[in-house]
Amino acid sequence: MARKSSLAQAAIERKPVLLRPQLNVPRMSGITALPMERRPLPVAPSPSAKPELPARSALVCHAAAASVPLPNSDSAPQPNVLLAKIRAIMFFAWSFLLSLPLFVTMMVMAPLVLAFDKYRRLAQHFVNNLWACASTAPFYKVTIIGRENLPPPDKPVVYVANHQSFLDIYSLFHLQRPFKFISKTSNFLIPIIGWSMFLTGHVMINRVDRRSQLKCLQQCRDLLAEGAPVLFFPEGTRSLDCKMAGFKKGAFSVAAKAGVEVVPITLLGTGSLMPSGKESQLRPGQVTIVVHKALPPNKNADQLCDAARQAVASSLPPELVGSATEMAPDEQ
C-alpha cells in the first residue's frame, strides 16, 4: 500500500507533457524532413483510379507540332475522295470497254474511209461521238448553250476553247461536229483510244519541238482547205487551277491565213469534275458548254486572239479568268 501511494503522489507531482502535432510525413531513409515547413504531399493514386487525360485540343497541338496524325483526324481519306476514286475507275473501265467494239468497227471501215473521205473521215467521227457520249452518260450531264451558233458540220472553221480537264474532249464531242483536235504525241500511243485518234485523223504535236509545231499548223491549214473543221485549245495545255491563261497565237494565225471563221467555246464544270493532275478522281456534277457567235474572218491574228479570249471569258466566273499575258508552260 505504501508503494502504491508513493506512485500516485509522483504522478500528481509530474508536470504535464505538451504533445506536439506530428505531420503525416512518410519516413525515407537518408532524407531529413524540415520541421518548420508544411508542404502538401502527393497522394498515391489508387490502383482502380483511371488516369486523367489531357483535353483533345492539347492533343491536337502536340500532334501538329510533332506532325503525327491523330486517330479520326483529317489525314484519313475522306469518304467523298474515296467515292471520287471509285467513280474514276468505273469511268475509265467503262470507256475502255466501249472502245473495244467501236475500235474494231473503225478498223473495218478504215480502208473505205481513206479511199473516199481522207480528210474529214465523217464515219470515224460518228463512231468517236457515239463512244464519247456513251462514256459520259452514266457519270455526268452535258448541257449545251448557244447551239444555234454552231456552224454546219461540213463548214471549215476554227473552234477555240478553254482547257481545264481531261474531260474536255469527251464533253466537246457532244457538239456532234467532225472537228480535228490537236493532242500531244504521247496520247496517240495509248492503246485503243490513241489508235482511234490516229484513225480519225487528229493532229499530233510535240509542244517543245519547233519543227513539230510548224508541221502541226501546216497540217491544220491543209485540213481547213479540204473542208474539215479544227479545234484548238489556245492555252496550250490544261490549267492546274482552272484559271484561263493567255491564248497563244497559233490557232488564230491558222484562221487568218485560211480566211475562216473562229468559233469561241467556253467549258464550265470539267475542271471541278476531274481537275488537272487528279485524273484518278471523278467528282459528281455537270458540264456546261457555251457556244459563242462566230468571229468573222480577219487577217489580223492578234485581233482574232483578243476577241476570242474575251468571248470565252465572258461566260467564266471572274475568279477563273487569269491574266491575258500569263501563258501556260509548255509540256511534252
UniProtKB/Swiss-Prot annotation:
Signal peptide: none annotated. One of its GO terms (molecular function) is 1-acylglycerol-3-phosphate O-acyltransferase activity. It comes from the Eukaryota. InterPro entries: AGP_acyltrans, Plipid/glycerol_acylTrfase. A motif (EGTR motif) lies at residues 235-238. One of its GO terms (cellular component) is membrane. It is found in: Membrane. Pathway: Phospholipid metabolism; CDP-diacylglycerol biosynthesis; CDP-diacylglycerol from sn-glycerol 3-phosphate: step 2/3. CDD domains: LPLAT_AGPAT-like (cd07989). A motif (HXXXXD motif) lies at residues 163-168. It is a multi-pass membrane protein. Keywords: Acyltransferase, Lipid biosynthesis, Lipid metabolism, Membrane, Phospholipid biosynthesis, Phospholipid metabolism, Transferase, Transmembrane, Transmembrane helix. The chain crosses the membrane at residues 96-116, 185-205. It catalyses: a 1-acyl-sn-glycero-3-phosphate + an acyl-CoA = a 1,2-diacyl-sn-glycero-3-phosphate + CoA. Pfam families: Acyltransferase. One of its GO terms (biological process) is CDP-diacylglycerol biosynthetic process. Disulfide bonds: none annotated. Its EC number is 2.3.1.51. Converts lysophosphatidic acid (LPA) into phosphatidic acid by incorporating an acyl moiety at the sn-2 position of the glycerol backbone. The HXXXXD motif is essential for acyltransferase activity and may constitute the binding site for the phosphate moiety of the glycerol-3-phosphate. Belongs to the 1-acyl-sn-glycerol-3-phosphate acyltransferase family. PANTHER family: 1-ACYL-SN-GLYCEROL-3-PHOSPHATE ACYLTRANSFERASE, 1-ACYL-SN-GLYCEROL-3-PHOSPHATE ACYLTRANSFERASE-RELATED. This is 1-acyl-sn-glycerol-3-phosphate acyltransferase CHLREDRAFT_174358. The lineage of its organism: Eukaryota, Viridiplantae, Chlorophyta, core chlorophytes, Chlorophyceae.
